[in-house]
């Protein structure tokens, strides 16, 4: 499992001209799932993200987690994170999980984040989405389970 995490001042996701998910501030997650991922991978990353100290304290040091600052999460499914661009000019997406498996694990992942005590907004799995955000910092990290 691979998640691109962006600390965001605000973020939203739109499908067919309608906002389907929106947060005032917190983390925007682009979530990629491969066919080898399990619920254990999803739970590991959910716990890791909830407790990563990437928000600044009063001294400007990254000492607070999203739980500490009472932020929210915007989670977006993103199979293209497993695009392999090493050969040719078109990405190969064979490492991305099949949609039915990926959707189930994506839903499980979002529930695991909620179990950590966070409010989670999502996009629409499998849809073409427009994602807007104001990246805070910018702070962008890649979190992987393997």
Curated annotation (Swiss-Prot):
Q: What SUPFAM superfamilies does the database record attribute to this sequence? A: DTD-like
Gene Ontology biological process terms in this record: D-amino acid catabolic process
User: What domain of life?
Assistant: Bacteria
Among Pfam families, the record links this protein to:
Tyr_Deacylase
Q: Which GO terms describe its molecular function?
A: D-tyrosyl-tRNA(Tyr) deacylase activity; Gly-tRNA(Ala) deacylase activity; Ser(Gly)-tRNA(Ala) hydrolase activity; tRNA binding
State whether it acts alone or in a complex, and with which partners, per the record: Homodimer.
Hey, which family's this protein in?
A: Belongs to the DTD family.
Please identify the protein, giving its name as recorded.
D-aminoacyl-tRNA deacylase
Q: Which species?
A: Bacillus cytotoxicus (strain DSM 22905 / CIP 110041 / 391-98 / NVH 391-98)
UniProt lists the gene as: dtd
């Amino acid at each position: 499992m691979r998640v691109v995490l962006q600390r965001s001042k605000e973020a939203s996701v739109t499908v067919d001209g309608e906002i389907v998910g929106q947060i005032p501030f917190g983390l925007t997650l682009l979530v990629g799932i491969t066919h080898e991922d399990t619920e254990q991978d999803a739970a590991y990353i959910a716990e890791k993200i909830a407790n990563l100290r990437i928000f600044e304290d009063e001294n400007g040091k990254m000492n607070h987690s999203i739980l500490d600052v009472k932020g929210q999460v915007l989670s977006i499914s993103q199979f293209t994170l497993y695009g392999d661009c090493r050969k040719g000019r078109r990405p190969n997406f064979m490492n991305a999980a099949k949609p039915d498996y990926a959707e189930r694990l994506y839903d499980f992942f979002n529930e695991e984040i909620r179990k950590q005590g966070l409010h989670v907004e999502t996009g629409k799995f499998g849809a073409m989405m427009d994602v807007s955000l104001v990246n805070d910092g910018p702070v962008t990290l890649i979190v992987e389970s393997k």
